[in-house]
């Protein structure tokens, strides 16, 4: 365990905004987590578990303790049909996917290059190119912050949805994910429905082929957060009614959409791009010129710049299409999680 007093959070969030915290503690084990949550010194302080900070925007000084998750380790067991991989929650997700591909554990390759750590994956139910975590997740192990006991949820108990899970609702602020177990079928079935992957639909395609192709696609479309500060997709793809979709198609016949149970899922990046916002900039914050769904820190952005830009994008899309975008990125103001409308009101009133 390592304790840092009133230090900058810049190295610990992929937006690279220069906010700070009262206290930063690095937790290297489950016992460290138990010690932190049971220590009377921290009882009245807000405590935020943080993995890679790849889906987080600190909007001002964090009044409390930021606990860096540095729980590492991997183990593999198997049945006749599946590999079961138990992954500690601090493991880097992109490195994990590459390790799986290199070691013959197929079925995870579509989730290549998604920034973050393994413990964050079930919170958001991360997904890309036709695959979601829920499709390969066997169970999630977590530390109950009330009892300080380790508990486990089966896949069905995690209540996975589109960028949703029980960890964002019923168990929010009540647990820390300590490990996940993945179930990967030994009989690999590639997921190639996504357009650019269609040229891999032949009998000779391997998991490495799919992994390499997805890395190529993502490298072209998405900026590397190690080079350009960003949190990946800033907004969720909205779901609208069939009637709303048909009405929009009269004006925008090329509007891309996908059938879902609730109606039509619309590509948020297309909405932003079609609104002419690619490259739009507010001080150091900018809509990425290649992928409109990504907001970037060009090097000098403050959290306020990013909030102003996000609010402008949200309002522009609402005015143009009558669609309200919901952000994927989680915002923290005064040590508490908040939302874009609240944060904008806080900054401008």
From Swiss-Prot:
Highest taxon, organism lineage: Bacteria
Catalytic residues, chain numbering: 163, 233, 328
EC number: 1.3.1.98
GO biological process: cell division; cell wall organization; peptidoglycan biosynthetic process; regulation of cell shape
GO CC list: cytosol
Primary location: cytoplasm
Localization terms from the record: Cytoplasm
InterPro entries: FAD-bd_PCMH (IPR016166), FAD-bd_PCMH-like_sf (IPR036318), FAD-bd_PCMH_sub1 (IPR016167), FAD-bd_PCMH_sub2 (IPR016169), MurB (IPR003170), MurB_C (IPR011601), MurB_C_sf (IPR036635), Oxid_FAD_bind_N (IPR006094)
Pathway entry: Cell wall biogenesis; peptidoglycan biosynthesis
Molecular function GO labels: FAD binding; UDP-N-acetylmuramate dehydrogenase activity
Start and end residues of each FAD-binding PCMH-type domain: 17-187
Pfam families per the UniProt record, alphabetical: FAD_binding_4, MurB_C
Keywords from the named record: Cell cycle, Cell division, Cell shape, Cell wall biogenesis/degradation, Cytoplasm, FAD, Flavoprotein, NADP, Oxidoreductase, Peptidoglycan synthesis
Named cofactor requirement(s): FAD
Catalytic activity: UDP-N-acetyl-alpha-D-muramate + NADP(+) = UDP-N-acetyl-3-O-(1-carboxyvinyl)-alpha-D-glucosamine + NADPH + H(+)
Family membership noted in the UniProt record: Belongs to the MurB family.
Function summary: Cell wall formation.
Protein name: UDP-N-acetylenolpyruvoylglucosamine reductase
Originating species: Aliivibrio fischeri (strain ATCC 700601 / ES114)
Designated gene of the protein: murB
């Amino acid at each position: 365990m390592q304790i840092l007093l009133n230090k900058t959070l810049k190295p610990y969030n992929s937006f690279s905004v220069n906010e700070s915290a009262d206290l930063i503690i690095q937790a290297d084990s489950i016992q460290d987590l138990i010690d932190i949550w049971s220590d009377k010194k921290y009882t009245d302080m807000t405590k935020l578990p943080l993995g890679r900070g790849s889906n987080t925007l600190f909007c001002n000084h964090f009044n409390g303790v930021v606990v860096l998750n540095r729980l590492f380790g991997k183990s593999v067991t198997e049945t006749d049909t599946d590999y079961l991989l138990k992954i500690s929650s601090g493991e880097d997700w992109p490195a994990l996917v590459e390790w799986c591909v290199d070691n013959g554990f197929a079925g995870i390759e579509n989730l290549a290059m998604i920034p973050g750590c393994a413990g964050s994956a079930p919170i958001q139910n991360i997904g890309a190119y036709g695959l979601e975590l829920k499709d390969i997740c066997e169970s999630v192990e977590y530390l109950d912050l009330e009892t300080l006991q380790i508990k486990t949820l089966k896949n069905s108990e995690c209540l996975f949805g589109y960028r949703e899970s029980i960890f964002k609702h019923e168990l929010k602020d009540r647990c820390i994910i300590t490990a996940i177990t993945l179930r990967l079928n030994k009989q690999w079935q590639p997921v190639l429905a996504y357009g650019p992957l269609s040229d891999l639909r032949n009998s000779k395609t391997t998991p490495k082929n799919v992994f390499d192709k997805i890395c190529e696609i993502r490298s072209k479309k998405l900026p590397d957060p190690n080079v350009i500060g960003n949190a990946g997709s800033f907004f969720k793809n909205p779901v609208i009614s069939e009637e709303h979709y048909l009405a929009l198609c009269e004006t925008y016949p090329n509007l891309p959409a996908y059938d879902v149970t609730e109606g039509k899922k619309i590509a948020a990046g297309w909405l932003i791009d079609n609104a002419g916002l690619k490259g739009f900039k507010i001080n150091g914050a900018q809509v990425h010129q290649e992928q409109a769904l990504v907001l970037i820190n060009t090097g000098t952005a403050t959290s306020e710049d990013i909030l102003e830009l996000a609010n402008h994008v949200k309002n522009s899309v609402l005015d143009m299409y009558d669609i309200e975008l919901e952000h994927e990125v989680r915002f923290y103001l005064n040590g508490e999680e908040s939302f874009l409308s609240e944060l904008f009101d806080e900054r401008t009133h």
